[in-house]
């Protein structure tokens, strides 16, 4: 059950991100901004990753070289928070928004620790409750 909830959350997050990107490109004609993952030119992205001089761990979503997978940042840190799962992995979710709520989640050093203890606010506390089947 917990895997289903996490998978569903990831699917919704990715679908929303793809829809937003589509609408953004549709309204602005692509704008000339190269996506971080190089989706417009997969071969270029693949070459950049394969030819990386990283001697530690290369984050697949961002191409950053870090000490281990747990240090990989979210691809969109200004709008996402990284939530650690009980098994040591992590997922990136959209930051909670709303008056009096969103400011609490701006610091990446602490935003993953916040638990609003409210199932209507999707933060890392909610992710952990969902993982345990409590939501």
Swiss-Prot record:
<comment type="function">
    <text>Probable component of the endoplasmic reticulum-associated degradation (ERAD) pathway.</text>
</comment>
<feature type="signal peptide">
    <location>
        <begin position="1"/>
        <end position="17"/>
    </location>
</feature>
<comment type="similarity">
    <text>Belongs to the LCL2 family.</text>
</comment>
<dbReference type="InterPro" id="IPR034543">
    <property type="entry name" value="LCL2"/>
</dbReference>
<keyword id="KW-0732">Signal</keyword>
<protein>
    <recommendedName>
        <fullName>Long chronological lifespan protein 2</fullName>
    </recommendedName>
</protein>
<dbReference type="GO" id="GO:0036503">
    <property type="term" value="P:ERAD pathway"/>
</dbReference>
């Amino acid at each position: 059950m917990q895997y289903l909830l996490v998978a569903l959350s990831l699917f919704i997050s990715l679908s929303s991100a793809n829809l937003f990107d589509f609408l953004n490109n549709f309204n602005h004609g692509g704008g000339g901004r190269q996506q971080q993952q190089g989706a417009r030119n997969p071969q270029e992205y693949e070459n950049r990753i394969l030819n990386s001089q990283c001697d530690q761990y290369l984050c697949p979503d961002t191409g950053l070289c870090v000490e281990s997978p747990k240090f990989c940042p979210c691809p969109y840190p200004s709008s996402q928070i990284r939530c650690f799962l009980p098994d040591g992995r992590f997922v990136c979710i959209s930051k909670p928004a709303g008056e009096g709520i969103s400011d609490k989640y701006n610091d990446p050093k602490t935003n993953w620790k916040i638990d609003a203890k409210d199932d209507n606010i999707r933060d890392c506390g909610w992710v952990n409750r969902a993982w345990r089947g409590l939501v």
